[in-house]
């Protein structure tokens, strides 16, 4: 699985002008299930995300996790994270999991976040979405369970 995580002051996602998910301080997680991914990879990724020490402590050092700060998460499906740009000028997305498998893994990842006690909201799988965010830092981290 692949994720692009961004530390945010706040974020929201809209579908057809209506807000479908939002969070205050915490993480915006753009998530992509890759072909062949399993629930075990989702578990590995989500556990790492919840424990990653990327929030500032009292001294201003990145030393606190999402769990430590009681932050929220907004999870948005993002199959374009599977882009292969090695040939030509048009990205290929064949490395992404098929939609049905991708959605199941996406929903599993969301359930895992909630199971860790993270207040989690989502976008709408497969929809065209407008994502609004206010970066904190900015802190943006690429994660890939196959790397």
Swiss-Prot record:
Catalytic activity: glycyl-tRNA(Ala) + H2O = tRNA(Ala) + glycine + H(+); a D-aminoacyl-tRNA + H2O = a tRNA + a D-alpha-amino acid + H(+)
GO biological process per UniProt: D-amino acid catabolic process
InterPro entries recorded: Daa-tRNA_deacyls_DTD (IPR003732), DTD-like_sf (IPR023509)
GO terms for MF: D-tyrosyl-tRNA(Tyr) deacylase activity; Gly-tRNA(Ala) deacylase activity; Ser(Gly)-tRNA(Ala) hydrolase activity; tRNA binding
Localization (cell): Cytoplasm
Assigned keywords, A-Z: Cytoplasm, Hydrolase, RNA-binding, tRNA-binding
Principal location: cytoplasm
EC number: 3.1.1.96
Chain span(s) of sequence motif Gly-cisPro motif, important for rejection of L-amino acids: 137-138
Pfam family, one: Tyr_Deacylase
One cellular component term from this protein's GO annotations in UniProt: cytoplasm
Subunit text: Homodimer.
UniProt domain comment: A Gly-cisPro motif from one monomer fits into the active site of the other monomer to allow specific chiral rejection of L-amino acids.
Family recorded in the similarity comment: Belongs to the DTD family.
Summary of the function given for this chain in its UniProt record: An aminoacyl-tRNA editing enzyme that deacylates mischarged D-aminoacyl-tRNAs. Also deacylates mischarged glycyl-tRNA(Ala), protecting cells against glycine mischarging by AlaRS. Acts via tRNA-based rather than protein-based catalysis; rejects L-amino acids rather than detecting D-amino acids in the active site. By recycling D-aminoacyl-tRNA to D-amino acids and free tRNA molecules, this enzyme counteracts the toxicity associated with the formation of D-aminoacyl-tRNA entities in vivo and helps enforce protein L-homochirality.
Record PANTHER family: D-AMINOACYL-TRNA DEACYLASE 1, D-TYROSYL-TRNA TYR DEACYLASE
Listed name of the protein: D-aminoacyl-tRNA deacylase
Native species: Jannaschia sp. (strain CCS1)
Source lineage: Bacteria, Pseudomonadati, Pseudomonadota, Alphaproteobacteria, Rhodobacterales
